């Protein structure tokens, strides 16, 4: 491949690599950047990412790059797929290297650590208002996407024409269906809150509560997500779509989810540190819980499930005690604006 690409993907973890593979499998010239030169050389030599996606070969039109400047110069379309806690730092590094015609889309799920700000606010702070922004989200396990299994996601952005171009670029009749959405805020929020609820669902299963309890957590978790989203100006309908209910069900019910497995370990009696070590990869929901809790408190939004998970992760409460407290709360109408 020469030094041009239709899209550059920043982040060579499991999800970034999977999206790069999907794009390249569509015949799009795709460039994948990672911050560690040695690791990227291994990817280039092996034509695979054996650490995260063992056995899946890179398409011919997927190139590897460890130089951020070269990666950003190669394409105007930049897809950021890094953990939420380094999202701002990566954009800060990228800013002086971006092309004037760059457009930024991210698949990072989460909020800004400590502040609970949406990533759109972080992006604008780091980049200013001169670049079109977009986000993609939905129920996706990286290995299934990379393997070409059918998947569906949603895309929303600040510029309708950019959103439309992303739908065309990402969509594949064989592997990936992409829906346009005009709710930029709502699409971002779902990816953070679902990680929190997935930890709760995992804890419930780890304790041994069964399918009834898991389903109740998912359902009431969706209520909490919707309530928080509406408080931020999002459209309630967004949360019954791919980036809301879709991502929530996937993450809460399948053991490919690191957040669910982390919660299961806690429910079985592991402490937080041991549970994280068992997973062996970033558990985004751990940070997301604090971020969502902080945001909800700031907005005055009642999120009882999120609050109990926060107390387990950050205040040492036993998962079984958190469950008891949720069950013993005052009786409410199911359709009440407060749970």
Curated annotation (Swiss-Prot):
<comment type="similarity">
    <text>Belongs to the NAD-dependent glycerol-3-phosphate dehydrogenase family.</text>
</comment>
<feature type="binding site">
    <location>
        <position position="247"/>
    </location>
    <ligand>
        <name>sn-glycerol 3-phosphate</name>
    </ligand>
</feature>
<feature type="binding site">
    <location>
        <position position="109"/>
    </location>
    <ligand>
        <name>NADPH</name>
    </ligand>
</feature>
<dbReference type="GO" id="GO:0046168">
    <property type="term" value="P:glycerol-3-phosphate catabolic process"/>
</dbReference>
<feature type="binding site">
    <location>
        <position position="14"/>
    </location>
    <ligand>
        <name>NADPH</name>
    </ligand>
</feature>
<dbReference type="GO" id="GO:0047952">
    <property type="term" value="F:glycerol-3-phosphate dehydrogenase [NAD(P)+] activity"/>
</dbReference>
<feature type="binding site">
    <location>
        <position position="109"/>
    </location>
    <ligand>
        <name>sn-glycerol 3-phosphate</name>
    </ligand>
</feature>
<keyword id="KW-1208">Phospholipid metabolism</keyword>
<keyword id="KW-0560">Oxidoreductase</keyword>
<feature type="binding site">
    <location>
        <position position="35"/>
    </location>
    <ligand>
        <name>NADPH</name>
    </ligand>
</feature>
<feature type="binding site">
    <location>
        <position position="259"/>
    </location>
    <ligand>
        <name>sn-glycerol 3-phosphate</name>
    </ligand>
</feature>
<keyword id="KW-0521">NADP</keyword>
<keyword id="KW-0594">Phospholipid biosynthesis</keyword>
<feature type="binding site">
    <location>
        <position position="284"/>
    </location>
    <ligand>
        <name>NADPH</name>
    </ligand>
</feature>
<keyword id="KW-0444">Lipid biosynthesis</keyword>
<dbReference type="GO" id="GO:0051287">
    <property type="term" value="F:NAD binding"/>
</dbReference>
<feature type="binding site">
    <location>
        <position position="194"/>
    </location>
    <ligand>
        <name>sn-glycerol 3-phosphate</name>
    </ligand>
</feature>
<comment type="pathway">
    <text>Membrane lipid metabolism; glycerophospholipid metabolism.</text>
</comment>
<keyword id="KW-0520">NAD</keyword>
<feature type="binding site">
    <location>
        <position position="258"/>
    </location>
    <ligand>
        <name>NADPH</name>
    </ligand>
</feature>
<keyword id="KW-0963">Cytoplasm</keyword>
<keyword id="KW-0443">Lipid metabolism</keyword>
<feature type="binding site">
    <location>
        <position position="140"/>
    </location>
    <ligand>
        <name>sn-glycerol 3-phosphate</name>
    </ligand>
</feature>
<dbReference type="InterPro" id="IPR011128">
    <property type="entry name" value="G3P_DH_NAD-dep_N"/>
</dbReference>
<dbReference type="InterPro" id="IPR006109">
    <property type="entry name" value="G3P_DH_NAD-dep_C"/>
</dbReference>
<feature type="binding site">
    <location>
        <position position="138"/>
    </location>
    <ligand>
        <name>sn-glycerol 3-phosphate</name>
    </ligand>
</feature>
<feature type="binding site">
    <location>
        <position position="282"/>
    </location>
    <ligand>
        <name>NADPH</name>
    </ligand>
</feature>
<dbReference type="Pfam" id="PF01210">
    <property type="entry name" value="NAD_Gly3P_dh_N"/>
</dbReference>
<dbReference type="GO" id="GO:0046167">
    <property type="term" value="P:glycerol-3-phosphate biosynthetic process"/>
</dbReference>
<feature type="binding site">
    <location>
        <position position="258"/>
    </location>
    <ligand>
        <name>sn-glycerol 3-phosphate</name>
    </ligand>
</feature>
<comment type="function">
    <text>Catalyzes the reduction of the glycolytic intermediate dihydroxyacetone phosphate (DHAP) to sn-glycerol 3-phosphate (G3P), the key precursor for phospholipid synthesis.</text>
</comment>
<protein>
    <recommendedName>
        <fullName>Glycerol-3-phosphate dehydrogenase [NAD(P)+]</fullName>
        <ecNumber>1.1.1.94</ecNumber>
    </recommendedName>
</protein>
<feature type="active site" description="Proton acceptor">
    <location>
        <position position="194"/>
    </location>
</feature>
<feature type="binding site">
    <location>
        <position position="257"/>
    </location>
    <ligand>
        <name>sn-glycerol 3-phosphate</name>
    </ligand>
</feature>
<dbReference type="InterPro" id="IPR036291">
    <property type="entry name" value="NAD(P)-bd_dom_sf"/>
</dbReference>
<dbReference type="GO" id="GO:0005975">
    <property type="term" value="P:carbohydrate metabolic process"/>
</dbReference>
<feature type="binding site">
    <location>
        <position position="15"/>
    </location>
    <ligand>
        <name>NADPH</name>
    </ligand>
</feature>
<dbReference type="InterPro" id="IPR006168">
    <property type="entry name" value="G3P_DH_NAD-dep"/>
</dbReference>
<keyword id="KW-0547">Nucleotide-binding</keyword>
<dbReference type="Pfam" id="PF07479">
    <property type="entry name" value="NAD_Gly3P_dh_C"/>
</dbReference>
<dbReference type="GO" id="GO:0005829">
    <property type="term" value="C:cytosol"/>
</dbReference>
<dbReference type="GO" id="GO:0046474">
    <property type="term" value="P:glycerophospholipid biosynthetic process"/>
</dbReference>
